[in-house]
Amino acid sequence: GYYWAHPLEIFATNEGGMSFHGGLVGGIIGGVLVCRMYKLDAWTIADLAVIGAPLALCLGRCANFVNGELWGKPTDLPWGVIFGGTAGDMPRHPSQLYEAFLEGIVLFCILQVLSRKKPLLPQGTFMGVFVMGYGIVRFLIEFVRVPDAQLGYLLGGVITMGQLLSLPLVIAGLALIIFAR
C-alpha cells in the first residue's frame, strides 16, 4: 500500500519506524557482501557478530526507556512507569526494560554458555540461537507493548507488525540451528 505509492518514505528515518527487523536483514545482506568481497566465511563472521549483539540491544532498549519511547500498555502492576507526554499519566509496562533484560542480558548469557561448549558447536548455531531468541522474546513482549501508531494491529486486531515480523525470525533461527554445519 503506502510505501508502494511513496517509496522514498522508506528512507525517511526522521519519521521514526526504524525496526530491528529491517536492521537485521540489512546487516545480514551487508555482512554477506563483505564476506564475499574479502573471502571470509560468512557463518563464522555471523556467529562472532551475534555473540555481543544482545548487549547492544540491551543498551538500545535502555535508551528507549530513558527517552520514553516504545512504552508498554497500561498496567496496575507495582512496577508500572508513568512516562508522561503522549503516553499520558497512567502507569505503563516498562516494556523497554523487559526487552533489555530478555533480549539483552538473558540472550547474551545463553550465547556465552553455548560458546563454552566443547566441542565447538557447528557454524551458524549462534546466529540461529540469537535470531530465534530475539524473535521469541519480541513476539511475547509485543503483548504488553503499545503497537506502532502508524500500524496498530493487523489481521483484524489479532497481531502486531512486530509479532508478524518476529515469526519468520523464530522459524529461520530454528532452521539455522537444525541445519548448522
How would you label these PLM feature ranges?
Residues G1-R181:
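A feature for loop-to-transmembrane-helix boundaries and adjacent hydrophobic helices
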